[in-house]
């Protein structure tokens, strides 16, 4: 209803101003600004829905001021470009319509009415309401009743008898199991669900709506609210360090806790969270690649579900035979948005909906088959009688190719339990949320029936039942939950540990690199993650007087304030204000001690603008002073005009990437010397080793042969035609996710370049 009202007010404002208000520059600018705000808000809502499937939520508030980079971003580029073009077209059209009768005399009354209607359209829009509520959640001091409802359970389970298998199905919400809406989509796992204790009304709350947040909610009974963006939690060294979570209780009760997934454990800090709360045995993409039968069988995120669940079964069998008490948690990935992935071993590889194949539904149908196969193996084993199996979604599905069909249904998260000791078939329609999952499991295992804000759905009352406005209540508790991190409010001295790549201050530890915004009684950490912009882009968003401490590789900051370090890949510390003074210090000891020293200087806006502009230069446009192309730093020497076919810098150098160009091309500003040596320090990837690699300068071509280790090759060229471009053609680029950013499409690697140098020859 509010959408219709806000649009009606918007339309009325446009029509009244265009046909009645007449000509006045001030009123035109004011009305266009407010109407433009309405457009921006609603396009933001649309874009947020595209990314999150849940409107403008807590994660969106973060990305409004930080670039979205990382997982699967290539699949969102086209919609993003479309939104920008649509926004431009709407603004141009809006301005043209409002000025249709600009030659008519100005009418104050109609101008005022049009402006008031425009303001009303903004106020009535759902986007404005969502943003207002989020902003309020950032500024509240908390809610006094948090201490009443947040309850810590006993740290042990008396006389535990049951092992636990907990399966997180990526985005595998209960809605997919509606056989009337989606016939025969989930027959295998659906049949198992129908034999279980099936909790049919598990709602999603703020701070539980992405994977690491859903894991925290289900194991600790609290939403993931933090003094930084949730997916950046890979940079912290401990995770809610004061809280008692399910893994802590299991470990204290004699359980060995295991976690198995196909993706990299570092993504979003899952490794930090699990290690902080009782898990000593973790297996992700790096740990599994030396164990699985086919290490090359991977999708954009890591190993396919069939591989992961096979390894989980092996671990279950091994642990069960040992007789020790254990918990085994596993997380699937094949149903990840926007499209999902199809394991090669499942029978259900295709699902048609609306008369055509739907990739997301196909991925769901395949993944549920793999999960069902894993569960049936456990059920058929002699150890099932001592086992509790839990199957849950980590969160509701985000915007995938099935999302518009899901939204037509009553959406809930998946949570069902199979007890080998006491088989029970029942559908429980009690109102609950993800935070109740851990408390319910704890209750079944013989522990307390509460965990944080979670309550057992078998013997307690969920917050979702107590509070009709539970979503608003959860946001009201946000400051209280953030305080559970015990995060420091000041930084005076700090220590950088080069062996561990960490910074420590005021009792907290963070992984490097790190950016800190420092103000009175607040230190805001801005880590670098797959979902956030590089730190220099985040720093560029700081105000001129904001105090900062930035710890990163020297070359990233040296261009601005310490050119002598512009080729150094060591750690450096920069601090100051973008509009004031800055200083850069080289970290030259294994344990380096530093102190903050912010000066209250006069702000220079020209300096501020220059710093911001320099920080925002994209990597390929950066230029440095050097007599060779050094590939382990961003950019290129000043003599290079442009280059292509080259991937991002890594600690050793850069790979060629045929996804960016079949050839490596380096074009210089001036013609290369008439006679010169081309000194190439490089290595080959995979089968490119020992094969001739063509290197061309103009019409002259030579070949070099590289191995899998770094070597230096010198080629002698004559350049009579004054060519200015070096071309290297990797013979057999190989698609791989090795060393890739999690969630990105595979790169096609050929040669790895460390340095290329042009040395002029006499004669």
Curated annotation (Swiss-Prot):
Q: Could you tell me the EC number(s) of this protein?
A: 2.7.8.20
Q: Where in or outside the cell is it found?
A: Cell inner membrane
State the InterPro entries in the record: Alkaline_phosphatase_core_sf, DUF7024, OpgB, OpgB/LTA_synthase_biosynth, Sulfatase_N
Q: How does it sit in the membrane?
A: Multi-pass membrane protein
NCBIfam families, A to Z: PRK03776.1
Q: Which family does it belong to?
A: Belongs to the OpgB family.
Query: What name does UniProt use for this protein?
Result: Phosphoglycerol transferase I
Q: Which organism is it from?
A: Escherichia fergusonii (strain ATCC 35469 / DSM 13698 / CCUG 18766 / IAM 14443 / JCM 21226 / LMG 7866 / NBRC 102419 / NCTC 12128 / CDC 0568-73)
Q: What is this organism's lineage? A: Bacteria, Pseudomonadati, Pseudomonadota, Gammaproteobacteria, Enterobacterales
